[in-house]
């Protein structure tokens, strides 16, 4: 995440969980961008009975289907951590910070990318992901509210690690 220091700090504040209980829960990007409806928390999947009211209201009557539909993954981001805020070169007003997190299955939904663009239009995001178990990786680049790159590729046996891949700069 890069941009004017004040804007980067606002993003960090936005994704910081004030009342976290355990290490790894200090930050939550997915849940703060698109919170799961409270009515769906603690529901079972699949639902034992179909709740038409919840389906009409949220598009789903259980947490699992809602998460997959809205976040593109069943748990959102977890074990999320961040680097220190770093200055960008000689410009004292520009900074960046790296966030690291795990998800189940994939990088997150297009809806989350749209929310990043809309809620933080003055920031730049480079989102890198890899799923070595399923042999895929990718990169999404957002520049001041606009998606300017969305690449994905297969990981091959000779590429054991995302650090071996050449990313767009």
Please give the residue ranges for each predicted region.
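Intrinsic low-complexity, intrinsically disordered or marginally ordered coil/linker segments
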Residues: 1-169
């Amino acid at each position: 995440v890069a941009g004017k220091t004040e804007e980067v700090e606002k993003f960090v504040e936005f994704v910081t969980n004030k009342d976290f209980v355990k290490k790894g829960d200090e930050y939550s990007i997915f849940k703060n961008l698109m919170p799961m409806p409270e009515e769906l928390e603690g529901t079972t999947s699949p639902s034992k009975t179909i709740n038409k009211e919840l389906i009409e209201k949220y598009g789903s009557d259980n947490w699992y289907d809602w998460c997959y539909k809205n976040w593109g993954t069943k748990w959102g981001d977890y074990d999320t951590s961040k680097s220190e805020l770093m200055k960008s070169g000689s410009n004292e007003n520009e900074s960046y910070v790296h966030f690291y997190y795990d998800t189940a299955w994939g990088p997150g939904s297009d809806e989350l990318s749209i929310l990043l663009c809309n809620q933080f239009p003055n920031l730049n995001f480079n989102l890198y992901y890899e799923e070595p178990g399923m042999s895929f990786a990718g990169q999404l680049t957002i520049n001041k509210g606009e998606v300017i790159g969305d690449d994905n590729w297969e990981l091959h046996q000779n590429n054991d690690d995302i650090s071996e891949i050449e990313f767009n700069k």
